[in-house]
Amino acid sequence: LTEQKKLFSTDRRDVHTLAEDINGADVFVGLIKGNVLTQDMLRSMNDNPIVFALANPVPEISYEDAMASRPDVLMSTGRSDYPNQINNVIGFPYIFRGALDVHARAINEEMKLAAVHAIADLAKQPVPDVVNDVYHVNDLTFGPKYFIPKPVDPRLITEVSAAIAKAAMDSGVARTPITDWEAYKQHLRQLLGQETKLTRKLHDTARLHPQRVVFAEGGNPTMLKAAVQAKTEGICQPILLGNPDRLKRVANRLKLDLEGIEIVDMRADNEQGRRATFAKHLAEKRAREGYTFEEAYDKMYERNYFGMSMVEQGDADAFITGLYTKYSNTIKVAKDVIGIREGYKTFGTMHILNTQKGIYYIADTLINRHPDQDVLTDIAKLSAGTVKFFNDEPVMAMLSYSNFGTDTAGSPVKVKNAVAEMQKEFPELAIDGEMQVNYALNKQLRDEKYPFSRLKGKDVNTLVFPNLSSANGAYKLLQALSPEAEIIGPIQMGLNKPIHFTDSESSVQDIVNITAVAVIDAYVEKIKNNK
């Protein structure tokens, strides 16, 4: 026997066959040939047996036969069409990656064990949406059918490689130590193209200034996962609205750890005092709009009224909502509780599209159905400020179906007038219109046909659409045609406080991204108020 095989040899004289040997065993690891393990053999094993049937393409016992023989078996094969595939790809590439990055002199046992622990720990963490999408499931969680990470899990490169590198350093075989682990993990994520500079910058900035963020639909699995992920990443201090017992049941089902996360039941008796305080403030604020204290108090049983009031009264810094409620209702609550910034008639939303051609800012994608000239002007002002908020310089095109007065009636006129108002108030701003979208995005075409434009020689990055249908349809069309494009939004602009929205289609990562925006928004708001 080779030295490796001698580790598994025995001097027992009472076993001569696999059936005798496996009786009462806890673990079976097979690397031999197909169909050598029978259902009777499997039934003879201890409770909750671990069976790794790794012969390929036919395992020692098929997955179907194993599961039919006993329900408590923890089963793995080497095949991708069954749960818990054991594949070299979840280990070897990242072991080599970590070893090479520290110029390790050897790959030792400490490093191998570090890989094992990193992979095992990863299986217990919430599963990224990208993994669920690949396998067409919604709720992969640690358990009998998922105790080994999937080979497509993008976190393997960061967690396993970093664990290997650290183990190499700790065991003395590394020649080039790593000092900044977060920078190292960012480098690894970039190798896979997992995150862009934009999202990385948002998350990094939010981590520097984490704020208290209220998540309205705490019992929604997607929002709950996002809140836990945001806390894990250090982006915010989550506050979940909802019934604590229900939230904990959902968290237990999803194997999510709620430790350190505040849960607020706005309908509970112990919140009577805050409901009264919030109602008094709302009734006084909207006294001339038909609000009585009793009506305002009743509204505080609703998550959006209560959650936004928490932000309004300083009990939280930002609010995320939208998965369950209609936008029209949420918009009304935001106007009632938070209010629109002084000097504006409305507020709006923007989506950021990070494409291969560059970053584009699109407005208004959610709020104003049929904006008039004044509302379009407000949207343009808010858009310019929001682009600057992201440390970019706005180059703005206000869009229509006509170009620079070719249609002197209908909606192009209000766009043209809004452009004139913006150019008068902000002569230094690069903004022009009305124009068709192809002229906005094709600098050469625009410069040749309309050389008088203020945008001559400039690449447009901000698109203001004439109404909600066109803006919303445009970003969703681009999203459908360019699935590789990263989209962040909707980003609220124009309310007095950081209130941000999601929709029923938002993924966990979408909500985490908008949470990072909300955190930065809240931090900037604090800086302004302290000046």
PLM region spans:
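Short acidic (Asp/Glu) and glycine-rich catalytic loops that position anionic groups and cofactors
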Residues: A25, L74, G91-A99, K124, ...
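A short helix->loop->beta-strand "cap" motif at the edges of active sites that frequently abuts
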Residues: N46-I50, R70-V73, K497
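Rossmann-like NAD(P)-binding element
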Residues: L1-E60
